[in-house]
């Protein structure tokens, strides 16, 4: 599990001095509760962090003390002035070009991304617990960072709402950093350039862009671990004649083709472009504030071939295509476990039992991650016990500590260790019984 006692994440730790309490932070520093809180702050070694955060809050709100914040809560005219100034500060900090309306629109996008992180978890990994983690309506609807920040000090709001306001601010900050990094590195244009390279040089010219061949992978699975023992490719014409038996799965894939030595080789391809909320989640899982961690591996492709020989053909084909496009292609960080051996991954929740051919291709000013499977390894990636992607999604959210950080026990009443085991069991049942 990651340690979230550093950087911006420390403010979400409900076991630390920045925890959201039953009442807002006290503006009376010399009260008994205030003195006890200061002692806890010193014991945690977070005094300097507190001073930095306090100064940032004061500067953002244009106040000189916590008493001024209390006055701001009761003065709507002054809040309007503060909010207008705050958008200007955010625009300059994150390098957002444009007038005030354009800056507000961009910040609103960060708000939608922050809400999207929670919606993604509520709709997928934690779908069985959606009613438990549903966001307070007022927090869901507020987009203004000033309004969200003031809620932290407003006694009218319940503890859960104040925590969610703070959480939303943290997620918005990460979304803004990622957006700034993407603009600096021109990721969007690089992605379009990557697609052009594939369409112009890699895929067969005998098919039109977007033209895909539907086939089905009929796989047999071992009862002890649901590993794939055999797989057959079934074309669309013969699909209706297939009757599945116990321990069999039928998986639809849409394949393209590339040309090698005058022949056409089929390949299933999934091109990765992470949505903003997925990038924020990656920073959370890694316990990182540096947006490069989420952005710099933005470009990626997963491919599935009929055999190991097909995988090697595709790798050589890529190298030749890059040359025809006027660029060398250099393979970096190559991992090949399709012929045996374990894949060593630093990612929390990932399995070393997942065979793959993985590398980063540096070409044409881009660095693209490629993960290439055979039909068998892809089926295992989808369905094998302790390996499947659904299990991996659950494990990395829970084992990294993200679930507990975003939905702490004292606010949501969810015991994450027990929930993790239940969810993995539920996903396994859905995979093996469907």
Language-model region placement:
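Charge-rich, low-complexity segments
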Residues: 1-294, 397-434
């Amino acid at each position: 599990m990651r340690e979230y006692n550093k950087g911006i994440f420390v403010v979400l730790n409900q076991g630390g001095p920045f925890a959201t309490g039953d009442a807002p932070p006290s503006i009376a520093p010399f009260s008994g509760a205030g003195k006890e809180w200061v002692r806890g702050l010193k014991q945690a070694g977070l005094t300097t962090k507190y001073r930095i955060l306090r100064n940032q809050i004061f500067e953002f709100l244009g106040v000189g003390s916590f008493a001024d914040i209390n006055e701001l809560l009761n003065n709507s005219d002054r809040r309007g002035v503060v909010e207008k100034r705050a958008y200007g500060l955010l625009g300059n900090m994150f390098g957002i070009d444009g007038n005030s309306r354009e800056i507000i629109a961009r910040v609103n996008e960060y708000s939608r991304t922050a809400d999207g992180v929670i919606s993604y978890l509520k709709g997928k990994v934690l779908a069985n617990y959606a009613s438990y983690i549903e966001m307070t309506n007022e927090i869901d609807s507020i987009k203004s960072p000033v309004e969200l920040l003031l809620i932290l000090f407003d006694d009218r709001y319940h503890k859960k709402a104040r925590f969610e306001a703070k959480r939303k601010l943290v997620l918005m900050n990460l979304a803004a950093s990622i957006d700034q990094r993407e603009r600096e590195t021109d990721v969007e244009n690089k992605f379009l350039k990557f697609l052009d390279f594939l369409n112009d040089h890699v895929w067969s010219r005998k098919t039109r862009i977007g033209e895909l061949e539907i086939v089905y992978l009929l796989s047999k699975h071992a009862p002890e671990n649901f590993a794939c023992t055999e797989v057959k490719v079934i074309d669309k014409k013969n699909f209706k004649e297939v009757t599945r038996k116990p321990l069999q799965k039928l998986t639809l894939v849409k394949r393209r083709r590339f040309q090698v030595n005058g022949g056409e080789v089929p390949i299933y391809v999934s091109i990765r472009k992470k949505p903003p909320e997925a990038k924020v989640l990656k920073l959370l899982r890694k316990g990182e504030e540096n947006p490069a961690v989420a952005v710099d591996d933005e470009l990626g492709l997963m491919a599935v071939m009929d055999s190991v020989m097909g995988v090697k053909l595709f790798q050589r084909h890529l190298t030749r295509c890059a040359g025809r496009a006027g660029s060398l292609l250099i393979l970096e960080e190559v991992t090949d476990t399709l012929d045996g051996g374990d894949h060593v991954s630093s990612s929390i929740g990932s399995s070393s039992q997942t065979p793959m051919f993985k590398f980063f291709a540096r070409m044409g000013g881009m660095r693209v991650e490629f993960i290439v499977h055979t039909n068998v390894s892809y089926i295992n990636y989808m369905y094998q016990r302790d390996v499947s992607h659904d299990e991996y999604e659950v494990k990395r959210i829970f084992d990294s500590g993200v679930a507990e950080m975003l939905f702490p026990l004292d606010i949501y009443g969810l015991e994450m260790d027990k929930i993790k085991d239940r969810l993995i069991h539920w996903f396994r049942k859905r995979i093996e019984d469907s």
